[in-house]
Amino acid sequence: MVVRLLSGYCAIFFLLIASISSTILHEQQAMAQKTTTSSFSATKPTPPTTSNFLTYQNPTYGIKIQYPSDWTMSQTGLRDYTNIVAFYSPLQNLTAVPSQFLLSRTHYSQNITLNDYGKLVNATLQQPGVQIVESKPFTLGDGTPAHSAVFIPPSGNVPFKPEIMLVWTVKGSNVYTLLYNGEAAKYSFYLPTIQKMINSFEITK
């Protein structure tokens, strides 16, 4: 039981750290690319319509999810072995920081309940400097029970304020997590898109 508990803590911390680190890396790269251009006409991004969504399917993990056609899908460069795929919002200008949607699966040797994993996540988020915006039961589009938590991590040396939504659901000994990570200032803008992605998520096996 202790080993499983510690494994759960590690998985959650790695997930959060990987997500935040990835966003910081993109921000630094964007800032580094800014050279002699003194100004850039920033175009306000337009949320994709329903017809502009593609389907990502992974038979190995038995999952399926829809994502915007103008977002970048990547299965490489992910920082934790539990990560399956990440999706990044379009860059609108040279200093833009993309929002990130990360899908992961953690496998345990024993069956896990949604309630037990929820207690683990909530305990993990009870850290100094973490602001929990909300934590509530959630139902996926196909009726699968899940849970969601929205929180703001400690800012540290990050040059922007991130806001994170973590949704998790459980099937047998597998925990599936869907993480939305972006600038707090743009969090609400992409929220309808993220909600559609989350609602489209299916466990196919």
Feature annotation, model-predicted:
Residues D70, E134, S148, N199-S200:
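Extracellular/lumenal ectodomain signal focusing on beta-strand-rich modules
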Residues T55-Q57, K64-Q66, T72, S104, ...:
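Generic structural detector for well-ordered beta-strands
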Residues K44-Y81:
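N-terminal "mature-domain start" segment
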Residues T76-T177, G182:
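Conserved polar/disulfide-associated segments of primarily extracytoplasmic proteins
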Residues E27-N52:
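N-terminal, intrinsically disordered, polar/charged segments of Gram-positive cell-envelope systems
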Residues W71-M73, N174-K205:
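Surface-exposed amphipathic alpha-helical segments
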Residues V2-Q28:
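Sec-dependent N-terminal signal peptides of Gram-positive bacterial secreted proteins and lipoproteins
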Residues P68, I84, G118-N122, L191-I198:
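Extracytoplasmic/secreted envelope proteins and their assembly/folding machinery
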